[in-house]
């Protein structure tokens, strides 16, 4: 069994995981040969000292399970008792090979490799008797870390970054990534309440003299005082500046004639200050541009971005091009050998609010205005082209760049999105890049809680199934005003299900978990789908669905189940089981009791029956049954009527 042990930290130590990065790369040997190596980089924080440390797991191990004694299962199990399984441990990079070897699929495994069908080997996870083998290695070690250490949410130090590009010599309408110089970088660090700006003073640029004048001005106390007052006014006055702690900020301006030195010093400062989280709004632009610009200047981005104190160097930046314009779905992430975790602030904002109503725009200016009441600096009285601004008014250009990170800070102060995503990642044992993805974090949460109860979750086999062409019909509709303030149902676990007053809950969504628990609904409790091919009665509702979707077709079996759950048992049996309706049932009852009555010639009057959808309650009718003596427990006509009403109409 694999354990996540960290040297110097015994079980129960108060440390919290910050990030995980699994790296697999090809290494060239001195003799000209090459081989793949893999390792897991774990960044964590000591909550007692506040210091951050790392742990590197070379060729990390992984434990999966199979049914004991070579047992085979006839179908997929959602979960199974851990006592019925045998654990198997192997290097994670050899996981599929190990499963194939132990299940006599070795030749098939190599055939897939020869055919470049590497994804085909992942179907080994669908073997019914194989469990717990399809977890992402980063999530797997997050779970192991949480089992051994406290892993509680901790205080996080945040920083913000924004760059500006000098696009005057661009070839197209907008600079290509890395094409033009970076002429300003704003870096705001929360922990020491300091805003840093790195400014490029290009001697060949037409605005060089303007920059020199600004340099002299901004390095004076008068310049700093004017900047502070300007920032206070821009965010909305002293109250708002105090609310977002903008009034506490100090400002430092650093000027460089060499662009490469400027970028290098930025990362050196980041290493020195070591924020826990670095937030960039639309990181796909800023970080990609920095990386490509370093390369354009003739340097290796690893030498700039990675921390020299860490023995391994890696920098992976994934941009989700498939969801490029769907910000709430974007899966951009950074893996870097650093003591700082990089996050896209825009994606975190959009992902957290997915489904709550679409924002008109996710631009920094629009979100800053709507969330925090703070906007970017408006330079429209000078120019409409940001590329021209540093040549027309360099002071406003510089302050515009500084103001961007201040807007970022105000948004985060208002939303606390970083605390949300990191806490969600911790409690669900899920990597930060997938913390908002329900299909990922819910599966990890299931694994965590089921394992605590002695069960091991099965693998997700649905990813290999074809998408269903039709939907399961069904709905639950109710009037919340009919519910009291008392618990509707008390579950065996002792948990109560409430419906609260003064709560807007469209489509009764809050009841879904309660309904699921009450009825024991889960993949492992499903036994099939009911089909009724031929018409059973003449009252079928072909228009029972309001959806125009092709998949929402009429289901005879669905209507039958809905009728059965309505509680109108007599009408259900009449329609679907060809039994008597209410009139016929009463006729049979009267005929039975008449035949068994002690007194002959009993006079009976029957309430006229009206066959309607959703039978109306039976009205009181004094002359309905007269002079009947029964040899049954219903010797009293009122008692009989009461029982009929009780059992026939719910």
Segments the model singles out, each with a brief description of its role:
Residues 1-493, 497-504, 508-509, 513-647:
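The two-metal-ion catalytic cores of nucleic-acid processing enzymes
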């Amino acid at each position: 069994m694999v354990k996540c042990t960290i040297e110097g930290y015994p079980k129960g130590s108060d440390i919290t995981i910050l990030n995980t990065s699994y790296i697999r790369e090809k290494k060239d040997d001195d003799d000209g040969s090459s081989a793949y190596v893999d390792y897991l980089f774990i960044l964590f924080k000591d909550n007692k000292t506040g210091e951050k440390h790392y742990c590197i797991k070379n060729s990390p191990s992984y434990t999966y399970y199979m049914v004991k004694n070579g047992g085979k299962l006839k179908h997929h199990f959602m979960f199974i008792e851990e006592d019925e399984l045998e654990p198997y441990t192997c290097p994670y990079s050899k996981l599929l090979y190990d499963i194939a070897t132990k299940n006599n699929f070795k030749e098939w495994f190599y055939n897939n490799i020869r055919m470049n069908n590497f994804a085909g080997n992942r179907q080994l996870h669908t073997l019914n008797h194989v469990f717990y083998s399809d977890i992402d290695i980063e999530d797997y070690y997050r779970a192991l870390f949480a089992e051994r250490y406290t892993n509680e949410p901790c205080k996080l130090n945040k920083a913000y970054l924004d760059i500006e590009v000098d696009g005057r010599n661009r070839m197209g309408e907008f600079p290509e990534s890395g094409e033009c110089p970076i002429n300003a970088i704003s870096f705001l660090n929360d922990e020491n309440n300091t805003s840093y700006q790195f400014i490029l003073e290009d001697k060949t640029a037409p605005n060089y003299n303007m920059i020199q004048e600004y340099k002299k001005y901004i390095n004076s106390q008068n310049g700093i005082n004017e900047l502070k007052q300007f920032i206070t006014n821009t965010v909305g006055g002293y109250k708002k500046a105090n609310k977002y702690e903008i009034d506490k900020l100090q400002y430092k301006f650093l000027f460089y004639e060499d662009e490469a030195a400027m970028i290098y010093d930025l990362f050196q400062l980041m290493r020195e200050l070591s924020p826990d989280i670095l937030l960039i709004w639309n990181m796909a632009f800023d970080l990609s541009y920095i990386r490509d610009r370093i390369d354009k200047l003739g340097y290796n981005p690893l030498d700039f971005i990675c921390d020299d104190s860490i023995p391994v160097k890696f920098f992976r930046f994934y941009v989700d091009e498939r969801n490029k314009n769907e910000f709430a779905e974007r899966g951009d992430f950074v893996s870097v050998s650093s003591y700082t975790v990089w996050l896209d602030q825009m994606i975190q904002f959009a992902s957290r609010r997915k489904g709550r109503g679409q924002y008109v725009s996710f631009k920094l200016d629009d979100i800053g205005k709507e969330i925090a009441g703070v906007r970017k600096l408006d330079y429209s009285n000078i120019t409409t082209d940001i590329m021209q601004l540093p040549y027309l008014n360099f002071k406003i250009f510089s302050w515009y760049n500084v103001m961007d990170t201040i807007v970022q800070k105000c948004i985060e102060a208002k939303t606390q999105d970083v605390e949300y995503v990191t806490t969600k990642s911790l409690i669900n044992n899920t990597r930060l890049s997938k913390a908002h993805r329900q299909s990922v974090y819910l599966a990890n949460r299931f694994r965590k809680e089921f394992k605590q109860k002695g069960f091991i979750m099965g693998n997700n086999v649905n990813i290999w199934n074809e998408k269903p062409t039709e939907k399961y019909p069904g709905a639950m509709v109710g009037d919340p005003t009919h519910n009291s303030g008392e618990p509707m149902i008390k579950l065996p676990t002792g948990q109560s299900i409430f419906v609260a007053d003064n709560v807007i809950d469209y489509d009764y969504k809050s009841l879904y978990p309660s309904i699921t628990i009450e009825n024991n609904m889960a993949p492992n409790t499903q036994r099939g789908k009911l089909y009724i091919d031929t018409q059973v009665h003449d009252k079928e509702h072909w228009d029972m669905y309001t959806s125009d979707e092709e998949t929402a077709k009429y289901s005879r079996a669905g209507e039958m189940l809905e009728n059965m759950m309505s509680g109108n048992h007599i009408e259900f049996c009449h329609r679907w089981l060809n039994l008597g309706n209410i009139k016929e049932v009463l006729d049979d009852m009267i005929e039975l009791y008449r035949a068994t009555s002690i007194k002959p010639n009993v006079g009976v009057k029957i309430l006229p029956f009206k066959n309607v959808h959703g039978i109306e309650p039976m009205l009181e009718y004094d002359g309905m049954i007269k002079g009947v003596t029964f040899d049954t427990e219903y010797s009293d006509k009122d008692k009989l009527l009461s029982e009929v009403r009780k059992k026939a109409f719910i």
